[in-house]
Amino acid sequence: MDDKKNIILSLDISTSTIGVCLLLDDGSEYGQIIELTHICPKVPRKTDKHEALFMKTDIFKDEFLNKYKGYGITRCFIEAPLLSSNNSETVATLLQFNGMISLAVYNELGVVPEYISSYEARKYAFPELMGIRKYGKDERQYEYSKIKKEINDGKLVLFGSYPWTIDKKSVLQEKVAEIFPQIKWIYNKKGELVKQNFDASDAFVALLGGLNKERYGEINFSISNISEKSNGNESEISYDVHYWDKVIHRTTYVDKTIKRDTSK
């Protein structure tokens, strides 16, 4: 591998699966995928839970780091652990494992990992996923006045144009598949994508998000050119969404007859 080329590693870490992306940053918008995969480090049953983390770290080193350490990897992005669990022991275990994998990357590759939250990774990788929240958690449309106000205020949220129950990881995997149609995804016997595909695609999202934030700077969204057409009980609200040097035209269709408690 040419030492002058910028080879970047990215990891999405959980104690059961490590999503891995190895990419050649060739200056293009998305780079070239060298490897997009996952590692499921298996240890014997009844292994002490603390020792298991050390064993899994060794498996990751043997199955991936040692295999690719000669590629001249120059950077490593790691998705920062999402500390939303109510189980403090689960959070502590994830933090420990994340730190152990980070240390393995540093020791084996001589690269200091860079961390990015899942929220920032998704927002910077695919800003077009930011949208006006149209539906509540009960999947019912918000009232017209609330939606119109959020458009006027430019209040965009991640996955805002999707229903609350949307499988976010599936949306991200589909976007990665669109960018790299040559990737061979893994399916089960029912023809369904296995969940480890999502760990792999999350690793790419972390990498792309980190690169985009560095390339284009902090991202700020604004809305302009708001116009509205009514067709009976339906309102068609059109507007432009601005971020970086890009403009995306959006249209939101709203049923004006909906009445509900907007706090839900």
What is the meaning of each model-derived region?
Residues M1-K264:
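Phosphate- and other anionic-substrate recognition elements at nucleic-acid/protein interfaces
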